Amino acid sequence: MASVKSFKRKYLKLRKSFDSVVLETEEIEQKIAEISEVYRRILLENAHLNDLLIDMNSTVLPTPPASPPGSPYWEAKPVSHTVFLESPSDVFTLEKPIASTHRWLSKLTALSKSTNSTLSTPKSFHSPLQSRGISPSSAQSSAAVSSSRKQKRKRTSEGPSERRARKK
């Protein structure tokens, strides 16, 4: 009889652990289903936003359609190609109307034309040290000073006469 009781105990213990694992698995599968649904929505929104950007870009400089044939945003007629402008500042001097569906874009481009002077000027290279106000030469000299301090510390602690006596 003792072996039957131990078998029942082991069986019940395994049954509890199995049930808990089954519940965890069901919860994980439910989370995966929710995440895949969100993933599909994000893919659709991303495709829609890409097509909006391409549409906006085609009003300034026409580009070929990026959507593959068969997608809901694919256009049957290709966009005509034009010769690209020499400098990027010429893009902002063009006065082409943006589609009426993109009113916020027309406001944004008008604002960027009037207020953003950096669009026409070339960006120069800045090192991270310069953005903090540190010149590269002073950074190298401070590194040399700190390494010489370490060497001095090592030299002073080497001699037995310079060691401190322990308090008892």
From Swiss-Prot:
One term under GO cellular component: nucleus
InterPro entries named among the record's database cross-references: Iec3_N
GO biological process: CENP-A containing chromatin assembly; chromatin remodeling; DNA repair; transcription initiation-coupled chromatin remodeling
GO molecular function: DNA binding
Top-level division of the source organism's lineage: Eukaryota
Chief site of localization: nucleus
Low complexity compositional bias, start-end: 130-148
Positions of the UniProt region annotated as Disordered: 115-168
Keyword Disulfide bond among UniProt keywords: no
Compartment annotation: Nucleus
Alphabetical keyword list: Chromatin regulator, DNA damage, DNA repair, DNA-binding, Nucleus, Transcription, Transcription regulation
Composition bias type Polar residues, residue spans: 115-129
Amino acid composition bias (Basic and acidic residues), ranges on this chain: 156-168
Function text: Component of the INO80 complex which remodels chromatin by shifting nucleosomes and is involved in DNA repair.
Subunit details: Component of the INO80 chromatin remodeling complex.
Protein's name in the database: INO80 complex subunit 3
Origin species: Schizosaccharomyces pombe (strain 972 / ATCC 24843) (Fission yeast)
Gene: iec3
